[in-house]
Amino acid sequence: MQWLREAKIPVGIVSNAQFYTQPIFESLAGTSFKTLGFDDNFLEWSFQVKEGKPSRVLYERLAESCEVRGIDPRGVFYVGNDLQKDILPAHEVGFLTGLFAGDKRSLRIGDVPFESAASLADAVITDLNQVREVVKLG
């Protein structure tokens, strides 16, 4: 994520999270989300809006946060591992999408054949370092 910070590209999270997720994560990691490179303006937690993925509400809120800060949502690259809960709703609000298929355990595509799931995303990512290639920054 260092190269994203250096390029001044904001990084956010959309998560089905409980109220304790952030403080527990930060306690276990020994650092804050901000220190890790996440921008507070782009953190969407389901418990805050009482809506969970795959609801478009979280993604619409993120798109609004982008627009308010002069970022075109069509230029946002959203990476997720779940076809139904990440890729489809992110695509519906206009984000470019990357299906994370780094391992079979985390990849969630349901009964959809992989090739079909992959075709619904703008890119397939098997390693987070590939994000750099997708956003064409070096």
For each predicted feature, which ranges?
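Asp-based, Mg2+/Mn2+-dependent phosphohydrolase catalytic module
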Residues: 2, 9-138
